[in-house]
């Protein structure tokens, strides 16, 4: 290093760049004379940065051992690349590993938004080259740039034009656009609802997405017609979303594979993550093979079977006839975002709110409440929580409570600030004490309810308690009934081995919500009842006609 410093000390930065390129391959190491002077003055680069930046950037640096293993797998799957792109290179684990593992690289492009990381990576590559001199190096371009403003098209088109094998590798940030928004991060794409969601879905957060998902989809769209492949560390949920998008995008991707990693061991974070592999230039594939990263043991296959997105293609085929359209409407429970005020506990006949205060209001507005954790451990007529329900339908004017339920109105008014401080835009412009997930169905005498959060799916039947219907919160889904016989029949269908098997072939157990409304609405219970030869009167079907279903024998 001392010899290098002596060589570049009295040169201008352009000549210094030529010297360094001949040593390690980095193109344009310095962008100015001042940068060269600073380099000489400060050989030890301070790469410390505040924890908030780490959160904003979704910054979990990849261990070298993991990056090298991924490069080995990439090499075996897609061959030795001529050109490599690392779009969010951080401290450069993938850059260093690829330079070691890929023998035929002609050009390497690394992009990183954190300028301190860029300085550290350049120095790391230079030191490696000085310690292990070589007569040939690929041209290495390291850009201090934002992915969302960087133009990849000329690089990718050059690779296509030359017929090169291209590798896209890396570990894009594991952070959502909403997290970055809350932290006022600049490392965020333009506001985009990438799934074109409308209305309530977009408002309540279904349009929230991982930055890594945006990055991956963008690069897949640009790279699909090239030779080579992609190897990315991604959250499992992101990989599923990419496969979901593939159904409509029909990108030229094949040999799609997900290899499960132990993120706790590798990154010391509790996240379900994998290495995602896909080959460019193939006929569109809609299936992903899942295996263990360390043992290479095959686990299962998920993806699209006809028009169905399933978690296990093999088990799905045996029960696919029951995947269709539900004749019953599943609804989520009450959403209020004001638990400390609306959710109550009952002890010795006295209600207490989440602030520890005694609550004395009209009893007819208070209902038993089941949350997700209660459903899987449900015992009849035993409730941890009760809920004050200020509306019987969405949009109802709660000012009428001032006359019909003065105690409740006074109580709600006391905590008006708590309601007005609710962050979700769903409440904007609505009644000040508004709730959602409420309607005539909420007050039906019989309900089948299920938690959306638990891997072990349990459907239970609940009925009136002390003459009151049981409410569920928005982590649960419900079917409502006037007839106990009909409710029991449908409960039997939901708990049948056929529906249980179907659900297991559809759910992803590492999802935030294991059970979703869209999944429940595809359970064809009427088909199952027909197969069982069961009959009971019901007018709950989409065509409005009365059909006959009954309890299973």
Language-model features and meaning:
Residues 1-123, 128, 146, 151, ...:
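Class I S-adenosyl-L-methionine
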Residues 55-56, 60-69, 88-96, 105-120, ...:
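Signature of N6-adenine DNA methyltransferases within the class I
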Residues 69, 73, 97, 101, ...:
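Generic, well-ordered alpha-helical scaffold segments in large soluble proteins
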Residues 79, 105, 137, 162-164, ...:
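Short, well-ordered loop/turn elements at secondary-structure boundaries
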Residues 87-91, 140-144, 426-430:
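Long, charged, glycine-rich C-terminal linkers/tails
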Residues 127-156:
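S-adenosyl-L-methionine
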Residues 136-144, 258-265, 504-511:
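A generic structural motif
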Residues 316-553:
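Polybasic, glycine- and aromatic-enriched phosphate-binding surface used to engage nucleic acids
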